[in-house]
C-alpha cells in the first residue's frame, strides 16, 4: 500500500520523536522471521521500554537526521527494523541479541550510542552494559569489599603492634 505525503511526514515525525528521547539505537534485518516470532519480539520490546518499528530507509534517514543516530545512515539498506532504547542504553541491543540467537535469519546490522557507530560484531559492548540496579550493586560490593579489607588491615596492624610490644 502506497503511503501519502502526510502519512510519510507523520512517520518521520514519530520516529524523530522516539530518536530524540532515546539513549541508544539498534538496526536489524528481519527478513525470513515469521510473523508470530516478530509479534513476540514486539511484545518483549514494549515490556523492556524499547520503541521498535519497521521503517522505509529514506524515511528513517530523514527521521534520524540531526540526531545522534545519524551515524547509522550507511547501514540503512534492505528491510530495516529499528529499535530505540528509552530506559536503558543496552535494552534494545540485549533484546535483539537474544532474539538473534533463537532466530538464525534475524541479522543485527549495527547500533549507535552517544553518537558513536557500533558495528554488528561489537554489539555485545552495548548489550552487556549493566542496568542501573546492576551498576549500583557492583559499586556497593566494591565499597563493602574495600571497607572489609581496611578493617582486616587495621586489625592486623594492631596485632603486629601488640606482638612487637610483647
UniProtKB/Swiss-Prot annotation:
Listed GO biological process terms: translation
Q: Which SUPFAM superfamilies match?
A: Ribosomal protein L10-like (SSF160369)
User: What PROSITE patterns does the annotation carry?
Assistant: RIBOSOMAL_L10 (PS01109)
* GO terms for cellular component: large ribosomal subunit
This protein's UniProt keywords: Ribonucleoprotein, Ribosomal protein, RNA-binding, rRNA-binding
Kindly list the GO molecular function terms attached to this UniProt entry. large ribosomal subunit rRNA binding; structural constituent of ribosome
- Summarize subunit and interaction data from the UniProt record for this chain: Part of the ribosomal stalk of the 50S ribosomal subunit. The N-terminus interacts with L11 and the large rRNA to form the base of the stalk. The C-terminus forms an elongated spine to which L12 dimers bind in a sequential fashion forming a multimeric L10(L12)X complex.
Spell out the family assignment given in the record's similarity comment. Belongs to the universal ribosomal protein uL10 family.
Q: What's the protein name?
A: Large ribosomal subunit protein uL10
Q: What is the lineage of its organism?
A: Bacteria, Pseudomonadati, Pseudomonadota, Gammaproteobacteria, Aeromonadales
Amino acid at each position: 500500500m502506497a503511503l501519502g505525503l502526510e502519512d510519510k511526514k507523520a512517520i518521520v515525525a514519530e520516529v524523530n520523536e522516539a530518536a530524540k528521547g532515546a539513549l541508544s539505537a539498534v538496526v536489524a534485518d528481519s527478513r525470513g522471521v515469521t510473523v508470530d516470532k516478530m509479534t513476540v519480539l514486539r511484545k518483549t520490546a514494549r515490556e523492556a521500554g524499547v520503541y521498535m518499528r519497521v521503517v522505509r530507509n529514506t524515511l528513517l534517514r530523514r527521521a534520524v537526521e540531526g540526531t545522534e543516530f545519524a551515524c547509522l545512515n550507511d547501514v540503512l539498506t534492505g528491510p530495516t527494523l529499528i529499535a530505540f532504547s528509552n530506559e536503558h542504553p543496552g535494552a534494545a541491543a540485549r533484546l535483539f541479541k537474544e532474539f538473534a540467537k533463537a532466530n538464525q535469519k534475524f541479522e543485527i546490522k549495527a547500533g549507535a550510542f552517544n553518537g558513536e557507530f557500533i558495528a554488528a560484531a561489537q554489539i555485545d559492548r552495548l548489550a552487556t552494559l549493566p542496568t542501573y540496579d546492576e551498576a549500583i550493586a557492583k559499586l556497593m560490593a566494591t565499597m563493602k569489599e574495600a571497607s572489609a579489607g581496611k578493617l582486616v588491615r587495621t586489625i592486623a596492624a594492631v596485632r603486629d603492634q601488640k606482638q612487637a610490644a610483647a
